[in-house]
Amino acid sequence: MSNLDPMRPRVSVVIPAFNVEGYLGAAIDSVLAQTLADVEVVVVDDGSTDATVAVARGYGDARVRVFENVRNQGPARSRNVAIDQARGEWIAILDADDWWKEDRLERLLALAEAHGADIVCDDLLLVPEGAPGPESTLFTVHAQRLGRIDKPFEVDALKMAEDDFGILKPLFRREFLDERGLRYNPAFRAGEDFELLLRCLLASARMVVSHEAMYFYRARRGSLVASPVQCLSQILEMTDALIRDVDAKTHGEIVQALEGYRRRKRDELGDARFREPLHAGRWGECVSLAVKNPAMLLRYAAVLGERFLPLGLLLVLVT
């Protein structure tokens, strides 16, 4: 039962915000419209140069609390500031350009109580940039890898490392985070979600994921980092740090899974390094990268061949 105590809300919703004047209102509105009324919103502005702060302060609602970083410090540090200021029993993560279904908190807290969970998440409704609504869900897009998901399931550290659920937006039991001194690692501007979730699981957190999709995830270019190359480079640094820190003797399977995760991200980085000049029309750079990497050449030969060289000549360059 909700106590509606403003000094001890059931849920504190953490929103780091940077230059999101056109999106932040929808995020906050979706929290204030929740069927669970016992909430507060903690917005931390990360050095915005637009009207983001004005949007947040414009609510004039005691449930919406606004803090400002003196300079841009990244989403991890901003979330930590918000968590430290939060007063709720649960900490919910919401990105400033996303929003929720109105009963998301009520459903996820019921799931947490039913399973005795320390962390609960749900599927994501994927909204492409510029689209009016979702076109798919995360679990649907990855159905070949994840299989059919039609009921809640638990995620342990090994499953997190193998299947990469780091993109999910969790609710954390505040007591669990505080007792174990766990926060986001501010050294990373990408991959920090995966890193914290894995460290929580290594600290014996119980994580349950709903098969329902109640979080609208907007795929917006430039929302966190400058480019996919920069993002993936940060994720690789984060993964290297985890592999160094995790005890291979105690958690050998997890280290092996992290090494596999690192290999996949390295492949993605190679592709991203090719796609950036491809999308920018820097064709000479594309050809140079393709010549150095025959596998990449075969994947993108049709594009390069139409624009630049016959496929046969491209193949000659690498044989």
Where do the protein language model's features map onto the residues?
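Nucleotide-sugar donor-binding/catalytic module of glycosyltransferases
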Residues: M1-S233, G312-L315
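C-terminal subregions of glycosyltransferases and related glycan-biosynthesis enzymes
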Residues: D5, L202, M207-V209, A213-T319
